[in-house]
């Protein structure tokens, strides 16, 4: 805590208001509210805190405060300040997270559309739906039952949908506006859950079609009835009164909060919203902030009722939401709130379980590996592997794992420069010398452990370079594979010995991931280089074919095989002079296999030119 903060803490009033924490750059990193500014702000700089709060406090170099007349005014101000400044430590709901609605437009001839924007335009909106797929499923069903207008600008002729029975073609039909308004009301009733009338009508039409031997049409009506039944089963009935309501529940544990919102429409649960985030203040107050952001940020229809847990300030929620606010004490509504709370608890428990498994796989694995090898926890592990085929295009690759996870920005590729032929030991010596010679020259942070993809010979080579030539003290281990090319043994120590490592342990799985990753990275680089060298070598020595023209040929034909199959005329089209194109054909088809001069139509199969990209 610096002197500026100390002096400001003495000036804090006991009034309600908002406080604004800033970092060394003057950037707002957290906005909070308090019933008593003095007590709340001082609490950040006194006593111990959990890890996330310690992280926040460590960045605070200044703060400001704004006094308000009431707690509710402070709540509203806090929400606006968060929206305006987007502090990194505050609850932030994504502005672009919106839900789809089905809309009946307020037009002379209404349309049925899906939209994510709710406007005061006289249209009828139904939803929200969990995703656009669910909304489309319902709309497709409605399109089959109700032939609304489909075109934005109706043509003088009938549209495609008219021919498949999904548009009335109002530009030529005799139906008046009242008919379409009546149809809009039927859709409205259907989307409100009042679908029995429509089902009865469809059953009547199905029976009539069957009597007149129109069995295909009768089958269509049957399929529609079944589709409505399927839709009914997907929407769980939550309340008998068929009201539209949002049901809030939350649960807190270990400094984290989960808020669940049930969207109940016409008594049916059609979607839920789940958010998990760390909280820094009183959980009830952070919940209120969440509710304020929820209705402020989202394109969301405010329902008839909002149900909230018992211990939440009802008046504060009323200031945030223009709806009937209830804290149910018993009965069906109380059960809904309890269900939302239960689901919030389950979601939070699942998060912690996943975190524990993640820590076990990463942090726990490196800690166990350090204990097993009797070295400090290997936070940074660098691993090497060589790749070549009969000594051609020899390469090596290094992958880096930090805290048990790949750090791809630190990966490195090496072309072997000093070795002729297939010599894994010499290649390993060169690469280790290049890598750690640079670490030494530039005073880079060395790894906590080097893992060599290889046996005793490669590991000893690495030890010679690291310890004897460069004088560095870095632990080095080796990973040997079995005859099935699977991770088999871990070598470590001086002299090297097989480490007793359980094949079911997380540290074994970590080493396996490292070995698989470095092998993948090395072999991918080798394939890329070999492909490039093969292309270049076969086109080398052709007069008039320089690097630029080679590049243009590869860009156009994608592979050497395609160039070989191309006619002279096709090569000329790429910008290569005819005499050079003929030379290319002679070089690639040396035994009189050159293709005709005139290009013929050919099938352009998908090339494999890019299959080696990582």
Swiss-Prot record:
Domain spans labelled UVR: 196-231
Major localization class: cytoplasm
Listed GO biological process terms: nucleotide-excision repair; SOS response
PROSITE patterns reported in the protein's UniProt record: GIY_YIG, UVR, UVRC
InterPro entries hit by this protein: GIY-YIG_endonuc, GIY-YIG_endonuc_sf, GIY-YIG_UvrC_Cho, RuvA_2-like, UVR_dom, UVR_dom_sf, UvrABC_protein_C, UvrC
Subcellular location: Cytoplasm
Domain of life of the organism encoding this protein: Bacteria
GO-annotated cellular components: cytoplasm; excinuclease repair complex
Cited Gene3D superfamilies: 5' to 3' exonuclease, C-terminal subdomain (1.10.150.20), GIY-YIG endonuclease (3.40.1440.10), UVR domain (4.10.860.10), UvrC, RNAse H endonuclease domain (3.30.420.340)
SUPFAM superfamilies: C-terminal UvrC-binding domain of UvrB, GIY-YIG endonuclease, RuvA domain 2-like
Pfam families attached to this UniProt entry: GIY-YIG (PF01541), UVR (PF02151), UvrC_RNaseH (PF22920), UvrC_RNaseH_dom (PF08459)
Region entry Disordered, spans: 595-614
Keywords: Cytoplasm, DNA damage, DNA excision, DNA repair, Excision nuclease, SOS response
Domain annotation GIY-YIG: ranges: 14-91
Gene Ontology molecular function terms on file: DNA binding; excinuclease ABC activity
Record note on quaternary structure: Interacts with UvrB in an incision complex.
PANTHER family with a match to the protein in the record: UVRABC SYSTEM PROTEIN C (PTHR30562:SF1), UVRC/OXIDOREDUCTASE (PTHR30562)
Protein family per UniProt: Belongs to the UvrC family.
Function per UniProt: The UvrABC repair system catalyzes the recognition and processing of DNA lesions. UvrC both incises the 5' and 3' sides of the lesion. The N-terminal half is responsible for the 3' incision and the C-terminal half is responsible for the 5' incision.
Protein's UniProt name: UvrABC system protein C
Organism: Streptococcus pneumoniae (strain Taiwan19F-14)
């Amino acid at each position: 805590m610096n002197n500026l903060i100390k002096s400001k803490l003495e000036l804090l009033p006991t009034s309600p208001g908002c406080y604004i924490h800033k970092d060394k750059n003057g950037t707002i990193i957290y906005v909070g509210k308090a019933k008593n500014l003095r007590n709340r702000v001082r609490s950040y700089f006194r006593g111990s805190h959990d890890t996330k709060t310690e992280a926040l406090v460590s960045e605070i170099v200044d703060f400001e405060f704004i006094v308000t007349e009431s707690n509710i005014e402070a709540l509203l101000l806090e929400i606006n300040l968060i929206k305006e400044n987007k502090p990194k430590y505050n609850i932030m709901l994504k502005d672009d997270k919106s839900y789809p609605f089905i809309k009946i437009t307020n037009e002379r001839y209404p349309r049925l559309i899906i939209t994510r924007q709710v406007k005061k335009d006289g249209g009828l909106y139904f939803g929200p739906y969990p995703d656009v797929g669910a909304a489309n499923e319902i709309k497709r069903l409605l399109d089959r039952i109700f032939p609304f207008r489909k075109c934005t600008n109706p043509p003088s002729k009938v549209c495609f949908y008219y021919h498949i029975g999904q548009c009335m073609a109002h530009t030529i039909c005799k139906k008046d506006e009242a008919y379409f308004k009546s149809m809009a009301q039927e859709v409205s009733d259907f989307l409100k859950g009042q679908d029995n009338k429509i089902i009865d009508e469809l059953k009547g039409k199905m029976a009539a079609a069957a009597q007149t031997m129109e069995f295909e049409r009768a089958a269509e009506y049957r399929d529609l009835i079944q589709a409505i039944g399927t839709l009914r089963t997907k929407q769980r009935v939550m309340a008998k009164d068929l009201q539209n309501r949002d049901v809030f529940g939350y649960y807190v544990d270990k400094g984290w909060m989960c808020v669940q919102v049930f969207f109940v429409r016409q008594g049916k649960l059609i979607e839920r919203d789940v958010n998990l985030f760390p909280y820094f203040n009183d959980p009830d107050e952070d919940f209120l902030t969440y509710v304020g952001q929820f209705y402020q940020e989202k394109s969301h229809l405010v329902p008839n009722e909002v149900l909230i847990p018992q211990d939440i300030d009802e008046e504060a929620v009323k200031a945030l939401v223009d709806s009937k606010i209830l804290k149910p004490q018993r009965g069906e509504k109380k059960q809904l709130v309890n269900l939302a709370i239960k689901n919030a608890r389950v979601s939070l428990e699942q998060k912690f379980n996943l975190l524990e498994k993640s820590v076990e796989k990463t942090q726990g694995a490196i800690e166990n590996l350090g204990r097993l090898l009797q070295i400090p926890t290997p936070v940074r592990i660098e691993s090497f592997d060589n790749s070549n085929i009969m000594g051609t295009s020899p390469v090596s690759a290094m992958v880096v794992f930090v805290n048990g996870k790949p750090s791809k920005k630190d990966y490195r590729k090496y072309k072997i420069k000093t070795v002729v032929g297939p010599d894994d030991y010499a290649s390993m010596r060169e690469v280790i010398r290049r890598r750690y010679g640079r670490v030494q020259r530039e005073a880079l942070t060395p790894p906590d452990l080097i893992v060599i993809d290889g046996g005793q010979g490669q590991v000893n080579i690495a030890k010679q370079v690291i310890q004897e030539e460069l004088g560095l003290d870095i632990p080095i281990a080796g990973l040997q594979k079995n005859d099935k090319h699977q991770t088999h043994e871990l070598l470590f120590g001086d002299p090297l010995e097989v480490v007793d490592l359980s094949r079911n342990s997380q540290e074994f799985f970590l080493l396996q991931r490292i070995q698989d990753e470095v092998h993948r990275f090395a072999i991918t680089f080798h394939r890329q280089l070999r492909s490039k060298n093969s292309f270049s070598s076969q086109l080398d020595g052709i007069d008039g074919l320089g690097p630029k023209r080679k590049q243009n040929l590869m860009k156009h034909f994608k592979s050497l095989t395609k160039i070989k199959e191309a006619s002279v005329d096709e090569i000329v089209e790429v910008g290569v002079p005819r005499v050079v194109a003929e030379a290319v054909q002679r070089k690639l088809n040396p035994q009189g296999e050159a293709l005709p001069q005139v290009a013929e139509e050919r099938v352009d199969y998908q090339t494999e030119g890019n299959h080696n990209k990582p």
